[in-house]
A protein has these predicted regions:
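Short, polar/acidic, helix-capping and beta-turn segments at strand->helix junctions
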Residues: 1-123
Length: 123
């Protein structure tokens, strides 16, 4: 088992790994819409969704995978009213079939984020 860290995605905000690689499966921690270079949160749900997915891509690339390897995602949104917007953007990042997914509305996310996305990928 290997803990993954890359500077191409935001550093963990607490005591957890950006991802854990167990050999056949990679478990990615939730990514917010934070710019990895500055730590700044993108403005609005559209920009945050794009950045969260870019951050997941960067973590997966660190272990030689892409979003095409993703089999499951969990999307956390602060407002289910943003569901359609998140879906529209999310759908543009996956080619060759969508992974299984859950979407959950929660009371709050770190740093006041509006969306967080985590994933599980396989080799």
């Amino acid at each position: 088992m290997k803990r993954i860290a890359t500077t191409n995605a935001p550093a963990a905000l607490g005591p957890y790994a950006q991802a854990v690689d167990t050999g056949d499966t990679v478990y990615c921690s939730g990514q917010l819409g934070l710019d990895p270079a500055t730590g700044a949160l993108a403005e609005g749900v559209q920009a945050q969704t794009h950045q969260a997915l870019k951050n997941l891509k960067a973590v997966l690339q660190e272990v030689g995978l892409t979003l095409d390897n993703v089999v499951k995602t969990t999307v956390f949104v602060q407002d289910l009213g943003d569901f359609g917007t998140v879906n529209e953007i999310y759908g543009t990042y996956f080619h060759g079939g969508f992974p299984a997914r859950s979407c959950v509305q929660i009371a709050a996310l770190p740093k006041g984020a509006l969306v967080e996305i985590e994933c599980i990928a396989v080799r």
